[in-house]
Amino acid sequence: MKENFWSELPRPFFILAPMEDVTDIVFRHVVSEAARPDVFFTEFTNTESFCHPEGIHSVRGRLTFSEDEHPMVAHIWGDKPEQFRETSIQLAKMGFKGIDLNMGCPVANVAKKGKGSGLILRPDVAAEIIQATKAGGLPVSVKTRLGYYEIDEWKDWLKHVFEQDIANLSIHLRTRKEMSKVDAHWELIEAIKNLRDEIAPNTLLTINGDIPDRKTGLELAEKYGIDGVMIGRGIFHNPFAFEKEPREHTSKELLDLLRLHLSLFNKYEKDEIRQFKSLRRFFKIYVRGIRGASELRHQLMNTQSIAEARALLDEFEAQMDEDVKIEL
């Protein structure tokens, strides 16, 4: 195996969760500017497309990263072990420091085809995928859920995953059936850690689910002794979620992050090949808590270009009465 960066991380370490159509190179750099986590994962890359001579062009932008983002981990999904083997070899050549396997995506057209969280119901295939991915020589980690249908599936499923000798397990503390409709099952953290200690003490354990910020993550790490904390949706409510010394933030800081997001979208649009409309999901992160925010968001949602969005921001900021503090 190549150098295992996981062993060099601080304890606890913090990860920005992989999120489809969210955690691309643009948004990762925005998060870095606000407050950087210890590890970045890419958004989802399909191994079947990656291994196809034509399909590769549709997913290559998902794997775009810059050297200042290291340690950079490629997050991949699929269900054919031989494709994971081939993908892992190529990812190592591309300079990634690790590979993370998606065994938790709950979306119906993924899970019901036996991929993502569907692999919870196919443990033998999941094991084959993990072992095949080691061919690239990079440390292999897994992101999964407690189970597919029921919470009590976690014991057999996680025992099986721990037995595969992986570098890190990121456990989303809900089942596939629960999606994100219920509170994460923090009450199971201690039992999961005990299972890890028994089966695979060298595998790191990262928790995910309803963790809004670094402060909460540190409290959970101190209480349960886990190794890592992964923050996902919390970053939409607080782009400064990974801040080591929390402080108050202002509306101008958020608008400055939006300007950065627009500039980075311009910079990487040739690599990512994304339409402008993909930006619209991000506007609500940056435009809130100030007079006129709702109207500005509405106007931004109707823009068709970076230039239009910038012009709206210029006009809005020129008329701002004051730079107000924002509750995150």
From Swiss-Prot:
Specify whether Iron-sulfur is a keyword of the entry. no
What reaction is this protein's catalytic activity? a 5,6-dihydrouridine in tRNA + NAD(+) = a uridine in tRNA + NADH + H(+); a 5,6-dihydrouridine in tRNA + NADP(+) = a uridine in tRNA + NADPH + H(+)
Known Gene3D superfamilies for this protein?
A: Aldolase class I, Putative flavin oxidoreducatase, domain 2
Q: Tell me the function of this protein.
A: Catalyzes the synthesis of 5,6-dihydrouridine (D), a modified base found in the D-loop of most tRNAs, via the reduction of the C5-C6 double bond in target uridines.
Question: InterPro entries in the record, alphabetically?
Answer: Aldolase_TIM, DUS-like_FMN-bd, DUS_fam, tRNA-dHydroUridine_Synthase_C, tRNA_hU_synthase_CS
Q: What is this protein called?
A: Probable tRNA-dihydrouridine synthase
- Cofactors demanded by this protein: FMN
Homology family? Belongs to the Dus family.
Swiss-Prot/TrEMBL keywords = Flavoprotein, FMN, NADP, Oxidoreductase, RNA-binding, tRNA processing, tRNA-binding
Q: What is its EC number?
A: 1.3.1.-
In the UniProt record, what gene is named as encoding this protein? dus
Chain segments annotated as coiled-coil in the UniProt record: none
Q: Superkingdom of this entry's organism?
A: Bacteria
Binding-site residues for FMN, renumbered to this chain: P18, M19, E20, K143, N208, G209, D210, G232, R233
Give the Pfam families listed for this entry.
Answer: Dus
Q: Name one GO molecular function term.
A: tRNA dihydrouridine synthase activity
Q: Where's the active site on this chain?
A: C105 (proton donor)
